[in-house]
């Protein structure tokens, strides 16, 4: 369904079961029966969400179920003045301040992991033949690296992920560049719709409370599994509407926004070429 305005671009999900946002525990129970962390179940289970904030929240919730001890890796951060002759911000850019800076695709200053955690690799590592967004499971910790097992390859491999260097501009002005040396991993019990592309997963909970906000988001999310019985959606109560169909198991149905670029549906007609 393609809508032409905010009132008509909603798509119903008539054949999917759902959890509402006040039933988070029920959603987790569906993913992990008895709310017990199961490393094998975690391999084939994922939560998809539209925002990094929602992803971080879900990741923390699931990781807290893992009974293993955690290890914290802190980055080595330095900053360089790039082109600011006035030197306005230099006085306030102490380590405590710039270690709080984060950017998408770059690991945070402090990372906390546990053995059996599911993660994504944030950068391609050609020397290890690892591509960006490869799913891995943590096996063992070392001082400056983490041993992992690859998951989405025909044959799993055991490799050590080292610290690598990231560079990005600071948000308080393009005059400063932060250099961060950190392990290129991020928890992946949950991931954004975009990050899930190319992933095939057995069991998926799709968090639609944030609504898709880009073309193709909904398609990517709902095409990660082969059987709709292994999909549940997580929605706000105001996203439920009466179906108008009697005799259905659910009298209400969740609706989400369908985003389609105008360029995709735009039709150009050459009137001069019409006889």
Q: What residue spans do the PLM features occupy?
A:
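RecA-like helicase/translocase P-loop NTPase motor core
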Residues: 1-275
């Amino acid at each position: 369904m393609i809508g032409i305005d905010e009132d008509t671009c909603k798509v119903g999900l008539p054949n999917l079961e759902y959890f509402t946002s006040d039933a988070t525990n029920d959603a987790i129970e569906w993913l992990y029966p008895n709310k017990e962390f199961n490393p094998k179940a975690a391999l084939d289970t994922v939560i998809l969400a539209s925002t990094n904030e929602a992803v971080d929240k879900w990741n923390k919730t699931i990781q807290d179920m893992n009974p293993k001890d955690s290890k914290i890796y802190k980055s080595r951060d330095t900053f360089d003045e790039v082109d600011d002759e006035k030197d306005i911000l230099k006085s306030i850019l102490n380590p405590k301040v710039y270690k709080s800076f984060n950017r998408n695709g770059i690991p945070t200053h402090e990372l906390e992991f546990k053995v059996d955690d599911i993660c994504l690799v944030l950068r391609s590592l050609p020397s290890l033949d690892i591509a960006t967004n490869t799913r891995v499971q943590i096996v063992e910790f070392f001082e400056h690296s983490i041993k992992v097992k690859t998951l989405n390859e025909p044959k799993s491999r055991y490799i050590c992920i080292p610290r690598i260097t990231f560079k990005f501009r600071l948000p308080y002005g393009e005059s400063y560049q932060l250099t961060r040396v950190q392990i290129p991993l991020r928890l992946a019990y949950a991931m954004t719709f975009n990050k899930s592309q190319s992933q095939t997963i057995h069991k998926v909970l799709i968090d639609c409370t944030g609504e898709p906000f880009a073309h193709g988001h909904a398609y990517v999310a709902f095409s990660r599994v082969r059987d709709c019985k292994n999909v549940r959606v997580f929605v706000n109560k105001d996203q439920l509407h009466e179906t108008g169909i009697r005799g259905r198991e659910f009298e209400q149905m969740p609706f989400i926004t369908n985003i389609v670029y105008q360029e995709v549906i735009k039709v150009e007609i050459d009137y001069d070429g019409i006889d």
